[in-house]
UniProtKB/Swiss-Prot annotation:
Binds to the N-terminal domain of the chaperone ClpA. SUPFAM superfamilies: ClpS-like. InterPro entries: ClpS, ClpS_core, Ribosomal_bL12_C/ClpS-like. It comes from Escherichia coli O127:H6 (strain E2348/69 / EPEC). Belongs to the ClpS family. This is ATP-dependent Clp protease adapter protein ClpS. Involved in the modulation of the specificity of the ClpAP-mediated ATP-dependent protein degradation. GO terms for biological process: protein catabolic process; proteolysis.
Length: 106
């Protein structure tokens, strides 16, 4: 009788492990923050280059950044969001712009 209980405990533990492994990953919003110095054309370039937006959608998001102070560029897993933030910030610095890209939990 003890062996049956051991098997059920193992089966329950295995199901819990599988359930935990199948949980969707945490998601993060990547956000561009407005400043008074970065040209609008550069923001559009960033949105096209790093987020694959067409010129129309990139322009809409650039205007949201400009008038609302910030805009969400996309929602990604932690690793992808962190990479995009780092790449955008590096690109902005390389081009001598103070544009800031951040992330926050979705």
């Amino acid at each position: 009788m003890g062996k049956t209980n051991d098997w059920l405990d193992f089966e329950q533990l295995a199901e819990e492990k599988v359930r935990d492994a199948l949980k969707p990953p945490s998601m993060y919003k990547v956000i561009l923050v407005n400043d008074d110095y970065t040209p609008m054309e550069f923001v559009i370039d960033v949105l096209q280059k790093f987020f694959s937006y067409d010129v129309e959608r990139a322009t809409q998001l650039m205007l949201a950044v400009h008038y609302q102070g910030k805009a969400i560029c996309g929602v990604f897993t932690a690793e992808v969001a962190e990479t995009k933030v780092a790449m955008v910030n590096k690109y902005a610095r390389e081009n001598e712009h103070p544009l800031l890209c951040t992330l926050e939990k979705a």
